[in-house]
Amino acid sequence: MTNIPIDRLSLNQMKDLIRLEKRLSQSVLGQNEAIEQLARAIRRNKAGLNRQSGPLGSFIFLGPTGVGKTELARVLAREVFGGEDSLIKIDMSEFSERHTASRLVGAPAGYVGYEDGGKLTDKVRRRPYSVVLFDEIEKAHPDVLNLLLQILEDGKLSDSHGRTVSFQQTIVILTSNVGAEQMIQDSELGFGASGQKKSASENRHEKNSRAALRELEEFLRPELIGRFDNVITFKPLSRSIVRRIFDNLTSDLVKAVARHGMTLDITSSAKRWLIDRGFDEQRGVRVLRRTIQSELADPLSDVLLSNKAKPGDTLEAKIDNDKVVINVNRA
């Protein structure tokens, strides 16, 4: 989309909001239900059907590590505000103490850091059309939660210099891993999508969502949770979804090799080996990208830079002695 303020969007750009699910699901796989809830709430707010004083949208993302929570926030920033640089990510582990929590709006006068401004307010003041991501909210000091309540109720904060910063054109997202262990234990990786299994999976997801919400209420007050548009629970990734994510992650390598006039062929055994190395239920696909870089892209770059291959050749990635090797097959 564009970085034009969302209250000035043209008819064509408004149509992009109608197609938001499709655009998001092209980049974030396996989380269709989460994407649908997110897109519907944003459209309701844009149509003026929700609170007018708060942010454009506000959400809590629950789920295991590496299933797409942060990635969805990043893609949302790109699709709604025109670029991934419109994502403001705040790591809550850095704001777990009272004196660090105050840094979000700026240190008080006379304290170290007063001239630096607020870690949150300064960023939003410079980029008022943005997705603001509070990552791992369970690690935040309670003072941070009070600031969040003010953002959701009033749509603004005052920094330590007395300047008012508007959050009304931001999308506010909290992420949390609460309930993740139970979700992972109950997940069924690699099963088909028969009606019976799908129904059982949906029932487990609903049960785990309720359990995660109860756990969330142990550190977030119900009145704060109630201010959010949606609490969205992400599902653990199935094996079939991970294979599609692998294809997405390796597509840039395929294109890069094609620019050399060559073809990259990743054998099924190499694909399985890389997925096994880069994915597990506890970490999701968080390390899959790094695994592809170190185990596939590195030997591939060695072949390209050594002039062992020439235009028209096929570079075959396969497994030999428990590692990826690149064979050059002449045209």
Segments (PLM) and residue ranges:
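AAA+ P-loop NTPase nucleotide-binding core of proteostasis motors
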Residues: 1-331
